């Protein structure tokens, strides 16, 4: 069989899909890195706000600069590029498997989480601190749950039984909460 136009188009689509997938993964990694680190900066900024004198002024000013550079220079661009590349892959895939529908639901929720971080970012840039460092630590772990769920769905490529998935997520959430409590005790000693 010769290499007709149909085969060439199919091969080109496969190659294109792989390159887009690689870029999609890279921007997912940088997006998650940004979300994990921005909450750490929120925590440090919140704790710096509790200090007095020059230490407070110097630290909060520095954390605002670091937050702005991270959020606007890395995290938002990565979220936007992820949003562009994901649907592009979906179009090239040419179908919508069941696992992808479930994954997309969690991706929409992840963007909701991202917007909640943007709300906190804007408030902290204005000097408004509504959340304690402990609440921010707990909020930070939500990204971990999203990461586990989305990666497992994308890797296993099937909708796991709801019982297995629910038990796994609840177990992970409990382990994360336990780790936060242990860390809090270690910090206060």
Q: Locations of the language-model features?
A:
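Polytopic transmembrane helical bundles with strong interfacial aromatic enrichment
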Residues: 9-189
């Amino acid at each position: 069989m010769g290499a007709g136009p149909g085969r060439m188009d199919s091969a080109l689509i496969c190659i294109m899909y792989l390159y887009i997938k690689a870029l999609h993964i890279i921007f997912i990694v940088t997006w998650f890195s940004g979300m994990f680190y921005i909450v750490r900066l929120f925590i440090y900024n919140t704790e710096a706000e509790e200090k007095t004198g020059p230490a407070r002024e110097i630290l909060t000013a520095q954390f605002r600069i670091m937050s702005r550079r991270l959020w606007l220079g890395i995290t938002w661009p990565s979220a936007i590029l992820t949003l562009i590349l994901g649907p592009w892959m979906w179009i090239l895939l040419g179908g919508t498997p069941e696992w992808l529908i479930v994954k997309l639901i969690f991706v929409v929720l992840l963007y909701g989480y991202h917007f909640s971080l943007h709300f906190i970012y804007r408030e902290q840039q204005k000097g408004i601190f509504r959340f304690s460092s402990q609440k921010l630590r707990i909020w930070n772990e939500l990204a971990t749950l999203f990461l586990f769920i989305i990666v497992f769905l994308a890797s296993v490529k099937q909708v796991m039984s709801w019982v297995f998935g629910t038990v796994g997520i609840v177990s992970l959430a409990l382990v994360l909460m336990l780790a936060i409590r242990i860390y809090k005790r270690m910090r206060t000693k």
